[in-house]
């Protein structure tokens, strides 16, 4: 008889497919087993099978509201030992990946239980997150994609942003920097605006603004990407480049579990140029010069005697005739990265808790001074205070420690010629190329140490005064603090043949010892109030509406101070610098506020014809009062044509077909600067004469030109798509064609240099983006797989 195997596990693989695994996902069952082994007073036995009578191996059986549970064995049978007889009304929860969870009420007569699990292969019943709510996938009229937390975890990356690479159509993920912990750049359906940062998608974590770098991979339950205006317009001015909605894991009501996950990975440098030794380099340079000027002969730069005898000269005097493999000096063969994650979940019908702790340690590929460490903690709590009142309290903490070299050799190391020495034979640093020595700068030229601290919270109250109507209030504070210490150390070099131990010559990357200290703290908070109403009239008319208000406030303060002329490089503090005053100092303070009103209406007739409308009115402090507010609309419609009578003959192989169309407008106000419409003054000094004495007096000056009537950049999006499933929902196809047009782009406009002010922003420029997406999938169960 065919046997069905159900694995409840978290999987961990190495980058580059090196098979090193250490996983203790089954620790989650230890509380169940321990509880079951202590003097059982009541035993429940049974079997779990499929609708085809095949045994299900590894199904999880839990007594609801308790920590007691077990799993089915290779024959599909199970035994659950309890300390006492279950109370009246108790029930078992039986679950297995790929099957619908089943609830079995316990009675006096069912000490031996037979459980039949039905396959859960209907993708259309999947619930997906949308703005300020969720819907079944079959009811969507907009374009979106989603990926669950298990798939995210299996992608074996250090950051959530990189885990999205190649995971969804229309979502492009690139990485321009390979430094440890570096986040990726995400583009949803291409570039939306030419303004820096305006093409970044809007990220919300559990409904409030956040950053993907705040998340550990094990925190994620689901990620949904809203791609068209009909889906994203409920978020208004922040959603022009798309929206990424992250749902984190909650406690649930399936008892208590503890999971530990350890991942070890190795990173290798790839696509590096082949090493060219000194002789090959000299020959190549001579050939280059000969091709440019044949009349000068073959040996225009390096003489024939030097080229032919270089290896002998190198053996006799390697300092004067070096052969340096710069890549080998600057790069390791591989770098180690590791992650530790501990998850605790506990829950019942009235309360649940999810606690995730993560630690990431990533070593860089540079020989020295490149590393990244991250500590994350996320605590999610849910409470049912009354049947009509629920609350949640979420707290997240993150600490990052990053070390970078003061001077990164990443660009130059690929083409520094081998004829320049990095070190002399006695270990002293050599001159390099005309005083530039990337190896000396990397090893002893100083570091940039960045320490970041972040705390976020979300406190939510949900009221359901009567069926179908709910009111939600959210307050979400966010605090972050960053301190950076950029300590450049003076590095002396020596020429070949110089036997002195003290040098007055320093590499060009570090001619002085200098320290820059930076401090930055930000505080923001989001307040939301929204109400949802759902009602079915008769049996055919399904209606839902949502209305809400949101307020966002952001404050930032920063401080920079630097000092040079350090007598030594041992103590990286400003007080240890030279006798001169702090040579540079600056301070900045910024504020930003947004206020929004929004609403949505959804209607479908017989789950066949769908319409949806959204409206959002946004106000931003970046614009003058007369231009501050913008209204953004969207509409979409869907038609499930497989529900029509003329499609009745295709039901054996054509399960579902829906046509979608949408139109929407979205705004953008993300530009560099918080007061682009307003003249700002910067502290400055003016120099003049008082009598015959040249005198410097403090004052203020205008540094930037402004445009008073600056207003919203607007992106209009059109989308046509289809959702199709065939062969009992095993084969699925989703296809979309989209067109985006951005008007009144917020760009800097050049002005005459003689004016003496920097260029202002203005609403100029138009950009078009178009494209298509296709997702083809097959979902099936084949034997034990």
For the regions a protein language model found, what residue spans apply to each?
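A subset of solvent-exposed loop/turn segments in beta-rich extracellular surface proteins, enriched
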Residues: 418-432, 492-508
